[in-house]
Amino acid sequence: MLRLGRAIAALLAMWAVATDAFAAPIIIVAVGASNTSGWGVADGSAYPERLQVMLRAKGVDAQVINAGRPFDTTGGMLGRIDQSVPNGTRIAILQPGGNDLRFLGSREQRSANIAAMASRLRARNILVIVFDPEIPRQYYAWDGIHLTTEGHAWIAASLLPQVLATLRAGAKPR
């Protein structure tokens, strides 16, 4: 009987290790415009990629999908939000940028679009972080619109504690 118990315990331990090894990573999708996409910086330097590296360094098995699209506005983001953020996503990061105002949109419409995106995502049980801070000027490139490599690092470092807190507060631990 003791052998049977040990055999069952060993099988359960192997099963637990096997299922954990095949567990899918936490999916996080970064939605935005050119700064999210990494316009003007080297591959792997955009904040979504940097955030993924930082999360993994903290022991979080996360895949951060970059759904940034240059020249996009919040209206465009709203129009593609369901396609850009697949089912199974745990967190969506909305980084709306300034194209609405640059392309003569109103602040009110921009705010309404951000609220509508967040509402649609939450209705799908996706946690939402709206990241729309005043980014320090030293992190902008010569054009005053796009971020430098250091600007992307700043965003990733700023988002990291928010993502970790969101995972702790609203998600089942893995």
Positions of predicted regions on the chain:
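Short gly/ser/thr-rich secondary-structure transition/capping motifs
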Residues: 12, 74-77
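Alpha-helical cap/lid subdomain in secreted, periplasmic
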Residues: 50-60, 76-174
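Cleavable N-terminal signal peptides
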Residues: 10-11, 21
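Flexible, glycine-rich phosphate/dinucleotide-binding loops
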Residues: 37, 73, 137
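Serine-esterase "nucleophile elbow" of acetyl-processing enzymes
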Residues: 22-70, 80-88
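N-terminal signal peptide c-region/cleavage motif recognized by signal peptidases
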Residues: 16-19
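Bacterial N-terminal signal peptides that target proteins for export
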Residues: 1-9
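Acidic-and-aromatic substrate-binding clefts and catalytic sites of carbohydrate-active enzymes
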Residues: 40-42, 70-75, 105-108
